[in-house]
Amino acid sequence: MRVLLVGASGFIGRSIATKAPEHFELTGTYHRNKPNLERIELEQFNFLDASVDWSLIVKKYDCIIIAARANGNTESSRNEVSRQANNAFTRFIEAVRESQSKPFIVTVNGSLSYGECGEKLVQVDDQINPTGYARSYAIAEQPLRDFLTDGQEVAIIRAPWVIGAGSWFPMMYLHSNRIPIIGNGMQWMSLVSVDELAEYVWKTVESSKSGVLHPQLTYRCRQKEFADIVHEVTSKKTQRIGIVR
């Protein structure tokens, strides 16, 4: 199977590339920083480039995994880049619709798309109500959601907090002097390791399972419990901070 991984240089993309089964013919893309990855072909590619002819890309692959994310330092800049991504993915979907070969599409996004759910367990058929960074990412994802709503072959994987080397965890919990307890610390934290998420992506590719999908969790706990675990390991003191919206 010929697979294209858009965003092989990112935190999640690198792990997906590393965990690729040997029987897949994998091509990974990067924008600026070429990753050091073995066994895969690497191509420089800016998916936001309006001149990209997606039809030439689509016809070469049996599956396309989108692990790239439109980033920005502020909400306005993220929204602007996400609008560009929306345009790019709209053209991508149009190329898929017009192609004789219909590659299976897998896109990796976050469970923050569901917003604040309190004690409620999120289900795959729940409506999105994005908060924080996810408000921007939802703009980019919209053409893929619409494609799925039309009954087409696409898997939207909504991952919770992804933990691993290069994730948010060292910055928030290891590099700071104190371990934060956010608000009353009773918010649920659902965690998945980046390696287990990558393995789930490949299982999805092999099964060609469409729909909104939730990977199996590595761990689930209250945020205060997570902070206490880090405290036990690092001996750093905890500190309560306000909730950032």
Annotate each language-model stretch with its function.
Residues 40-91, 95:
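NAD(P)H-binding glycine-rich loop region in Rossmannoid oxidoreductase-like domains
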Residues 28-34, 47:
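N-terminal Rossmann-fold cofactor-binding loop
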Residues 3-23:
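N-terminal Rossmann NAD(P)H-binding glycine-rich loop of SDR-like oxidoreductase domains
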Residues 148-189, 194:
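NAD(P)-dependent short-chain dehydrogenase/reductase
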Residues 90-132:
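Conserved Rossmann-fold NAD(P)-dependent oxidoreductase catalytic core, especially the SDR/UDP-sugar
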Residues 138, 151-152, 162-174, 203-214, ...:
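Glycine/proline-rich active-site loop of Rossmann-fold NAD(P)-dependent oxidoreductases
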Residues 200-245:
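Mid/C-terminal beta-alpha module of Rossmann-like enzyme folds, strongest
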Residues 116-156, 161:
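Catalytic helix-loop patch of NAD(P)-dependent Rossmann-fold dehydrogenases
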